Amino acid sequence: MKLVLVSTRGVRSLNSTNFPAPWPFVKKGAFGQRKIGPMNYEKFKWPGQNREFPELSPKFQKLNPKELHRYTGVQADGFHDEKTGEFVPVKEMRSELVVPNLDGFKLRPYVSYRTDVQIEKRRVAYEKKVLEKGSERLADLHTVEDERWPPPKMSAETLFELAYGDTVRSAYKEGKYGNK
């Protein structure tokens, strides 16, 4: 085996180790997908190298400015006094929510009239199904969930019916749950 002396001073020479192939060729000892072409490794990607973070983050850089020691990305509601070194809160800089008083406001949020028609259709159809089958439980078994109104509340029994109801009923009819 031939050892190659490579400069450690950061100087590039015409040594072949400084000029790797643009992609790994399929050969003995290749790893990953055995193909010819460029390969991207996630382990070599560091956060911030391609400007993923717009803020200057001391986490991924060697410089660690004092201004960013307790940086949270939140606008401060005051300033640091350089003479005393203390934080001075300013009332005008404090963020506040401005919510209008809607007491006595006549308008309501807009909902399309077509929605009301669809809801009414679903309610009437479901009530007919309840009258036809005799109870809400039987009507629920014979109604698609999207056609029910009001929509069903999910209970343990409903979940069991949706997941195992048909198989348990068919197994019971076949006599698999009898005394043996």
Curated annotation (Swiss-Prot):
Transit peptide region: 1-21
Record Pfam families: MRP-L27
Alphabetical list of InterPro entries matching this protein: Ribosomal_mL41
Major localization class: mitochondrion
Gene Ontology CC, one term: mitochondrial large ribosomal subunit
One GO MF term attached to the UniProt entry: structural constituent of ribosome
Protein keywords: Mitochondrion, Ribonucleoprotein, Ribosomal protein, Transit peptide
Keyword tRNA-binding: no
Domain of life: Eukaryota
Subcellular location per the Swiss-Prot or TrEMBL entry: Mitochondrion
GO annotation, biological process: translation
Subunit: Component of the mitochondrial ribosome large subunit (39S) which comprises a 16S rRNA and about 50 distinct proteins.
Family membership: Belongs to the mitochondrion-specific ribosomal protein mL41 family.
Listed name of the protein: Large ribosomal subunit protein mL41
Source organism: Caenorhabditis elegans
